[in-house]
């Protein structure tokens, strides 16, 4: 039995976050994100502009066991502190492996997803936008894919907030320009979506 049978290669991009809050107040600090699988972790660059709507667009290649030991991928967001020298946690989200593996998500399929962030008390503190692709293994159709397979991979935007979706389609970075553009994030879909579930209908999509 091959090594690829036990593990799958993933390509995860932590794109951005929206409406970050600390103690229910909009965050103004510089932030970064951390992806965790099992005992391994990968950190993004720091968003130097700071604020509640950071953009990272950092992509990581990683391997994930496909046995029952890993059921979730964790995304954590931290902000830089000026005095203590220790970064503080804003919130985290857990992404079920079943959201991007098996079922109707074949290997090589690029999934754009948005997840609720919650702080240590379980309160909602923002949304994180990610893309996840399970790379085809050597026994599948990997050899037939062009070197730029990321660019031509099938794409599903169904669970991504519409602002990030529009930016991704045009290969652009998205950040709200005025306070009026932040109004729609206040309720995050009426609070009916919880950590670990994609934010399917949190935003009204443009007509």
From Swiss-Prot:
Membrane-crossing residue ranges in chain numbering: none
Further details from the record: Overexpression of BAP2 can suppress defects in bap1 mutants.
Reported consequences of knocking out the gene: No visible phenotype, but accelerated hypersensitive response (HR). Bap1 and bap2 double mutant is seedling lethal.
Gene transcribed to yield this protein: BAP2
Subunit structure: Interacts with BON1, BON2 and BON3.
Residue ranges the record marks as coiled coil: none
UniProt protein name: BON1-associated protein 2
Organism this protein belongs to: Arabidopsis thaliana
Sequence ranges assigned to domain C2 in this UniProt record: 1-112
Keywords tagged on the record: Membrane, Plant defense
Gene Ontology biological process terms from the UniProt entry: defense response
GO cellular component, one term: membrane
């Amino acid at each position: 039995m091959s090594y690829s049978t036990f593990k799958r290669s993933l390509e995860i991009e932590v794109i951005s976050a929206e409406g970050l809050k600390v103690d229910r107040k909009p965050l103004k600090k510089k932030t970064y994100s951390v992806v965790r699988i099992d005992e391994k972790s990968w950190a993004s660059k720091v968003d130097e502009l700071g604020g509640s709507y950071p953009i990272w667009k950092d992509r990581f290649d990683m391997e994930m066991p496909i046995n029952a030991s890993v059921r979730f991928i964790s995304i954590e967001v931290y902000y830089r502190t000026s005095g203590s020298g220790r970064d503080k946690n804003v919130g985290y989200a857990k992404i079920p492996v079943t959201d991007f593996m098996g079922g109707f998500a074949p290997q090589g399929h690029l999934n754009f997803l948005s997840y609720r962030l919650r702080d240590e008390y379980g309160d909602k503190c923002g949304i994180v936008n990610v893309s996840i692709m399970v790379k085809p293994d050597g026994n599948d159709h990997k050899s037939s894919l062009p070197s730029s397979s990321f660019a031509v991979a099938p794409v599903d935007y169904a669970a991504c907030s519409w602002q990030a979706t529009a930016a991704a389609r045009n290969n652009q970075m998205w950040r709200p320009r005025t306070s009026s553009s932040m109004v729609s994030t206040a309720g995050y879909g009426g609070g009916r979506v919880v950590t670990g579930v994609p934010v399917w209908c949190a935003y009204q999509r443009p007509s």
